[in-house]
Amino acid sequence: MINVLIVEDDPMVGELNKRYLSQIDGFQLKGIASSFQSALHILGEHHIDLILLDIYMPGKNGLELLTELRAQNEAVDVIVISAASELDVIKKTLRYGAVDYLIKPFEFERFQTALSDYRRKQKVYSTHRNMSQKELDAELFQKKEATEKVQLPKGLTKSTLKLIWSSIQSFENESFTTEDLAKHTEISQVSIRKYLKFLEDIQVLNVEMAYGTIGRPVFQYNVNNSNINGIKQYL
């Protein structure tokens, strides 16, 4: 599990971030801090992997907290979630190692993309000791080999495909259903079926029919690891 600290002085926003976080597998909330000092206290009490950091706070702000963490060489990652849209602030947080930056107000889909991308990279770090340039480009920097541009079928979008594929990856090698994905992504089952059909057509997913407790057929999907690269040209 990835241990998370939310640093947010607005209780309503803090609770919203908490609720959003609870909908994404692989993350565990260790605390919510409303100030610079309370954040340092929680960091001293718990092992934290990721901070969801607001910038504007009374007293010392989030940027000062980020600066302090880097001065102490703390091995913690930061995703900024703030109303601060000034380019100077954004540039400074990125220089200090923020891995993503969400400007309030934001949609759940953007939040989920940020967290899912972070989780994916942590998985890469935990399963590799060395990487080739090709692996580094593909796995961390999301650079793609020069290929002929491939269009998605009509009615499908790259952003939704990315979101659904990220959710599919969270199941790892476990089977899943359309309903499972709908709960993860908050996308309708009707829409999800279109994307699953596409992934089945390009042989990235395997599908089997099973029967539920009341006898109705249920389609169980799992990733076809032998052809997993087939999706890259569409993302």
UniProtKB/Swiss-Prot annotation:
Entry comment on modification after translation: Phosphorylated and activated by MalK.
SUPFAM superfamilies: CheY-like
Subcellular location: Cytoplasm
Keyword Transcription regulation in record: yes
UniProt keywords, alphabetically: Activator, Cytoplasm, DNA-binding, Phosphoprotein, Transcription, Transcription regulation, Two-component regulatory system
Chief location bin: cytoplasm
Ranges of residues in domain Response regulatory: 3-119
Pfam families documented for this protein: Response_reg
Superkingdom: Bacteria
Molecular function terms from GO: DNA binding; DNA-binding transcription factor activity; phosphorelay response regulator activity
Residue positions, PTM 4-aspartylphosphate: D54
The keyword Transmembrane appears for this protein: no
GO cellular component, one term: cytoplasm
DNA-binding region residue numbers: 178-197
Function, in words: Member of a two-component regulatory system MalK/MalR. Activates transcription of maeA, maeN and yflS in presence of malate by binding to their promoter region.
UniProt xrefs under PANTHER family: TRANSCRIPTIONAL REGULATORY PROTEIN DCUR-RELATED, TRANSCRIPTIONAL REGULATORY PROTEIN DPIA
Name by which UniProt lists this protein: Transcriptional regulatory protein MalR
Source organism of the structure: Bacillus subtilis (strain 168)
Gene: malR
